[in-house]
């Protein structure tokens, strides 16, 4: 089957600082984070541009999830700096939050809503157009057509994970931050996720993925567990 030609992502270059065209879109220098007096990670440097994929490896407790939360702007680092399009950003910065999609361990799926209702609700929160065609395409990308109207509480963990990942296909955000995205997925769903990730990168998107499963073509950042 020939490779698909995904539509390019929306152009956000107008929010650049002067001269940012020559800089990474996302850059971090010396990031550190502690919890309850314990250093979770420190000295993290990274830089991403269009089409870049970074996999974050490490044992359980090494700080992979905490790093994603810092990079997402959900929590502030204790040291270091984070830059988005050449501008320093802090936790909660709208320019970063509006450009990223985050899927964590918790799927964020309302168990009382169906997959289609969950996608419509997530789209409203994100300010994304949720036309019937867009929602149908996102659900189809993850093979959810037959269960799209079933309450999420009646679905398996794997199907709920598919519904969470379908939001990526709908939102078309520039930066994906994903925490163990293939957890609970069968081989078919994992292949569908990989196809969406490949499309995202070919369209100029970026992704940082905390994972135990190696990703083809990814650069690697390895975190060490701290006692």
UniProtKB/Swiss-Prot annotation:
Keyword Translocase: yes
UniProt main location, coarse: membrane
Coiled coil segments of this chain: none
GO CC field: plasma membrane
Domain ABC transporter: 26-227
Topology versus the membrane: Peripheral membrane protein
Entry's EC annotation: 7.6.2.5
GO molecular function per UniProt: ABC-type heme transporter activity; ATP binding; ATP hydrolysis activity
Family the UniProt entry places it in: Belongs to the ABC transporter superfamily. CcmA exporter (TC 3.A.1.107) family.
Protein name: Cytochrome c biogenesis ATP-binding export protein CcmA
Native species: Cupriavidus necator (strain ATCC 17699 / DSM 428 / KCTC 22496 / NCIMB 10442 / H16 / Stanier 337)
Name of the coding gene: ccmA
